[in-house]
Structure formats: C-alpha cells, structure tokens
Amino acid sequence: EYNDNVNKVETFFKKPVYKNKYEWYIGGKIDGINDDNVLIEVKNRMNRLFYRLRDYEKVQIFSYLYILELENARLVECYKKQNNCNINVIEVGFDQDYWDNEIMSKVVLFASMFENFMENRDKRVELADILLGTNPA
C-alpha cells in the first residue's frame, strides 16, 4: 500500500544526450513526482494488468529518470472494468549499465546514422525513389 502525495507536473523536460554535427536531445512529460523524489508514471490498461515492466515502458521511464537525474520510479498500471479499478505498482530503479548499453548506445548509433544519411544526397534520393515507387529495383 502506498500513501504517496503525487505532485502533478506539466513541464516538458529535455536533456542533451549526444553531440556530433548536431546536438541531440531526449525529452518528455512525466505524470508526476512524489514527495520522496520518486517518479510516478501511470499507464491505463485496456484489457488487463501486465504485472511486469514492458520493454518500451522501461525505455520511457529510464529516459525520464536520466533527464531528471532521479534514481527511482513507480509504474502504476490501472485497469478499469465497469465499476472496478484494479491497480498494480511496479518499482523501477535506474541502472546505469542498462542505460549506457541498451539505450544510449542505440541513440548514438541512430543519431550518427541519421546525420550520415542527411549528408549523403545519393542515399536521400534512393530513399525518395523507394517511397515514391520510382525506383526500378
């Protein structure tokens, strides 16, 4: 049982994560932070509670923790069925190794590949041809 006083936050937060030719940022709007500086993220489920942290939610929560320099989060999943509301809380702690190896490494790879793509006219034309169906290949 939790007796959190959750402070709703309306601010869009962002933080630079990589710089090459351009500066790359991650950002987002969080649901709230409790009085103990624990990030609160609420997910309203459509069919059922998952009782585990989904990969895409982990990336989202880790990004928020990184941006805000927080260590802990709670994912609150809610499933409403008729007049009942089932709630499950999943505790999430920031893991620097996971952040570096599973998230940031992919952000850096994407950013560098995108910058290379944008500087390569032939690659841009090739993609346009594919998307427009004008590529004979």
What are these regions (language model features)?
Residues 1-137:
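Accessory terminal regions of nucleic-acid processing enzymes
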